[in-house]
Amino acid sequence: VLIVSARSTAYSVAPLIYGFKHFNPAVKIAGIVFNQVSSPSHFAYLREACVDAGVECLGYLPMTEGLKIPSRHLGLTLTAKRSMNTLIEQAAELVEKYVDLDKLLSICHRNFPCRYTLPYSSEIGVESFAPSAKKMKIAIARDPAFNFIYRENIDRLSALGSITYFSPVYGSDLPDADLVYLPGGYPELFARQLHRRKKLMEALRTYAEEGGKILAECGGMMFLTRSLTVRQGGTAYAMTGILPLDCTMVGARLHLGYRRIEYKGMELRGHEFHYSNVVAPDAMPSVAKQFTARGMEVSTPLYRYKNVIAGYTHLYWGETDILKLWEV
């Protein structure tokens, strides 16, 4: 189902819809829901465009001021859970009113021939993992600085053992764990607070030196470097120092795109989305090759120090046994 913004467009959206329908034969556009529709008469033009483009129109969401979420340099501004729940409830009411849910649900039960592009095997599951893996203790950083996490990754980890969340920003101690997961987020907005967490940083250094498994993505990787500089001429805030690297927001340039990673016979998928840079990325050799969705090799590194694996790419594990990262 394709969601199409109808802002500042009407019937002229037809070529766009037609293009999505025919551009990639492996992608089946089963129906369209329009967003930001200004009026019923506006929707009438959009529905006509769907008919002429040969795609089912499932309905629309009217332009609603209360549903707008502010954005910032790495996407949406994260709001309090309570206000987000209110927003979701409001959106759900509009969906029930303006979207043909019966038609949408009927589409969900159709069989569409397609070609999978992500690693998938119906034979791979939690039961195929090592029995001892189910008893793992897993610590995950989760707070305003570290919160870019695929829900499926959490589900994977939950199947492997018990999860304990901790907060580097608010001064949590490092939980007792067999695996520490430091996801991405906004460490640059909390560099001063993170810099003050000496006890946690010392615990992470000890954990790493003793061979503890750490997986750090993007902002999590930045926390493991020696320093983080937020602005030109500003303080280079000391970070954990596990990786002999330095990160900076100075000269920030957007790096983004889907990534395919080749690492010692494994293939992983994910995405890269950040403005920061490693000052001297070659100070540590990359242990993997990374490619765009079109197969072009990129310079994005994946670092490894003992059992610490870190890089800018946010990994989507799919049905990949992530523990194999430490077996190869």
Model-derived regions, located:
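Short, solvent-exposed amphipathic alpha-helical segments in soluble enzyme
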Residues: 17-19, 47-51, 153-159, 196, ...
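Cysteine-nucleophile active-site neighborhood
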Residues: 187-262
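Internal gly/pro-rich beta-alpha loop/helix module
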Residues: 11-125
